[in-house]
Amino acid sequence: MASGADSKGDDLSTAILKQKNRPNRLIVDEAINEDNSVVSLSQPKMDELQLFRGDTVLLKGKKRREAVCIVLSDDTCSDEKIRMNRVVRNNLRVRLGDVISIQPCPDVKYGKRIHVLPIDDTVEGITGNLFEVYLKPYFLEAYRPIRKGDIFLVRGGMRAVEFKVVETDPSPYCIVAPDTVIHCEGEPIKREDEEESLNEVGYDDIGGCRKQLAQIKEMVELPLRHPALFKAIGVKPPRGILLYGPPGTGKTLIARAVANETGAFFFLINGPEIMSKLAGESESNLRKAFEEAEKNAPAIIFIDELDAIAPKREKTHGEVERRIVSQLLTLMDGLKQRAHVIVMAATNRPNSIDPALRRFGRFDREVDIGIPDATGRLEILQIHTKNMKLADDVDLEQVANETHGHVGADLAALCSEAALQAIRKKMDLIDLEDETIDAEVMNSLAVTMDDFRWALSQSNPSALRETVVEVPQVTWEDIGGLEDVKRELQELVQYPVEHPDKFLKFGMTPSKGVLFYGPPGCGKTLLAKAIANECQANFISIKGPELLTMWFGESEANVREIFDKARQAAPCVLFFDELDSIAKARGGNIGDGGGAADRVINQILTEMDGMSTKKNVFIIGATNRPDIIDPAILRPGRLDQLIYIPLPDEKSRVAILKANLRKSPVAKDVDLEFLAKMTNGFSGADLTEICQRACKLAIRESIESEIRRERERQTNPSAMEVEEDDPVPEIRRDHFEEAMRFARRSVSDNDIRKYEMFAQTLQQSRGFGSFRFPSGNQGGAGPSQGSGGGTGGNVYTEDNDDDLYG
């Protein structure tokens, strides 16, 4: 242990991950010799390990599995590899490329008797004596070593049968000599039972939380395997571990894997199950669980959903819960000093657990199993797809990069959804009535990248199921004009997500918020949607008035929850539409219930400041009344970029008209540029309305002409064969002319003047067009904005004072 720990003072968790340099650790390779009892090494390796041909060796694999084999030398095998066939690999629960350890095992006795049973699906339809046809030729004169629990495959009589070693005497391993008695009576073993033990979770099946897993290994495996270590140092090993994190990150899975890999007795307590209506029974259920575990030490007790049985005592009204919490506390304290029982618990609400449980000596280690990052997601996807048939075009890295905020459970769902989609495509080739499916169809099944794309469009991160997070279907093409605004937005949201290294290089944290303001109908909401879509971030849209509720304190809690969710699903864009409804200037709201609106603003302010820099959460606010918004929200560091989205100019109007009509058939002679020239002062929404009205008129005409044609057919059936062309193939000029008769401006000149005044005031209070550092060439022109006078520095301080107290 020391060799790993003292290298540059690494902490234990990484030390355990590093494999020590041991010569008896070898990499598993495919066997050339197909014998079930033979493994082969290179001659130099055998010399190093002091082994001879024909020696019996003990191999240790994953999940505490062992096997006993005969070792032979093989010149084609490289020094660090060991060749073994599939049967041995399955018994050791390892795959090609895994690492196993090998050690000499000289004292294997000859067996007196062994008991083997066949596995049911391999012996179906076999008549005759299993022993004579299979077992006798397999063991005769071979002196094979076997171990209890091994499964071996015997070929003979046209087919292969699998047997499992149920019992050996002496146990747990022996050599089958000519005078060993072989029993094979009894019911065949069911394949399902075997599969279950094969599919037990191990550490390999957990992805995306390496660091946490290393921490847990250190806390669980060390005390269970080497209690002497702690004795030598003179401390007690940790007793309890609390795993917490959002649902679906793999807390229960980790506990199962730990139990399987350590070989400890695993006792699962599901929180709600131990509750009972009879007084005293729930507590005795708990006591029984702990007694059972102590009898079978070393043991792991795993309490799932701890918050169900140990809520805060002052908050619960039921007497039963209080008694259970007290019982759990006394049991955790009363675990005998050296009884190797470790209590693990999982919850996704650590703050609702009684604080007495979270002190040292009870659940003294808390491990946060968070949402995995892109590398973690890739690990998880590789684990879930290792048994899937993937087409060559599947790029799991790409999928991992696009699934922001997904936890392990979501990724598992994603993989199965993609596989189902692959099957759906082949559904027309599959006849459900048939007993079997063609081998051709089976072989052609493969999951392609398109299936993953489809599954991605269907799946949401589970943390955000209730606040519907849609990645909107709006792209930059849908937005006409506003080029500068688009560029600024891309810099704000896409750079921190796509180029975090640049921010590190220049030592800056990216800015977090933007406020759009401008007249209604200019595309503020549309911009927010497009940015969320372009950078593949999650998008939570919050309508201002929805946050306010009638209950005291609940509105603030809503704000808190939304920010928590956004942090969980980072990178995430939080879009506050109609910000003025919830962020009015404080103090002026007379008649609002108990100052609820003020408290909501305070909560939003603190959340914006407290957003940890690690997470990419961006806030976009939109309003058309910027003058009534609380100035504290508009300071740099919160919504630091104020972007005025003006009415579109002529060029933008053409772009908007084109964007609106890009899917519609429009006649060649419709001059959109002229239309744009005539619609001065129209907002984007007004222009969209003109296009819609023109479409509507074209549709109306088309339907009317169809009805007319139908009537003509009925009156004159003989003329039916004549194929007429479409009377209204496209939207014509007269449709637009008619639509323009009803067009109106939704924003008056007066309103625009107000917005422009506001924009100008902001510019004046913030900009210094003439600021230059003093150097050889001083100056520049006079101040373009700002009231000027004196040096740039003076203006700056005065202006700042002005801004602060103004």
UniProtKB/Swiss-Prot annotation:
Gene3D superfamilies: 1.10.8.60, 2.40.40.20, 3.10.330.10, 6.10.20.150, P-loop containing nucleotide triphosphate hydrolases. The modification N6-succinyllysine is found at K668. Its main location: cytoplasm. GO terms for cellular component: ATPase complex; ciliary basal body; cytoplasm; cytoplasmic stress granule; cytosol; Derlin-1 retrotranslocation complex; endoplasmic reticulum; endoplasmic reticulum membrane. ATP 2 binds at G521, C522, G523, K524, T525, L526. There is a cross-link at K8, K18 (Glycyl lysine isopeptide (Lys-Gly) (interchain with G-Cter in SUMO2)). The modification Phosphothreonine is found at T436. Necessary for the fragmentation of Golgi stacks during mitosis and for their reassembly after mitosis. Involved in the formation of the transitional endoplasmic reticulum (tER). The transfer of membranes from the endoplasmic reticulum to the Golgi apparatus occurs via 50-70 nm transition vesicles which derive from part-rough, part-smooth transitional elements of the endoplasmic reticulum (tER). Vesicle budding from the tER is an ATP-dependent process. Residues 797-806 are annotated as: Interaction with UBXN6. It catalyses: ATP + H2O = ADP + phosphate + H(+). It is found in: Cytoplasm, Cytosol; Endoplasmic reticulum; Nucleus; Cytoplasm, Stress granule. Homohexamer. Forms a ring-shaped particle of 12.5 nm diameter, that displays 6-fold radial symmetry. Interacts with NSFL1C-like protein p37; the complex has membrane fusion activity and is required for Golgi and endoplasmic reticulum biogenesis. Interacts with RHBDD1 (via C-terminal domain). Interacts with SELENOS and SYVN1, as well as with DERL1 (via SHP-box motif), DERL2 and DERL3; which probably transfer misfolded proteins from the ER to VCP. Interacts with SVIP and DERL1. PROSITE patterns: AAA (PS00674). This is Transitional endoplasmic reticulum ATPase. It comes from Rattus norvegicus (Rat). Keywords: Acetylation, ATP-binding, Autophagy, Cytoplasm, DNA damage, DNA repair, Endoplasmic reticulum, Hydrolase, Isopeptide bond, Lipid-binding, Methylation, Nucleotide-binding, Nucleus, Phosphoprotein, Transport, Ubl conjugation. ATP 1 binds at P247, G248, T249, G250, K251, T252, L253, N348, H384. GO terms for molecular function: ADP binding; ATP binding; ATP hydrolysis activity; BAT3 complex binding; deubiquitinase activator activity; identical protein binding; K48-linked polyubiquitin modification-dependent protein binding; lipid binding. The modification N6-acetyllysine is found at K502, K505, K668, K754. One of its GO terms (biological process) is endoplasmic reticulum to Golgi vesicle-mediated transport. A motif (PIM motif) lies at residues 802-806. The PIM (PUB-interaction motif) motif mediates interaction with the PUB domain of RNF31.
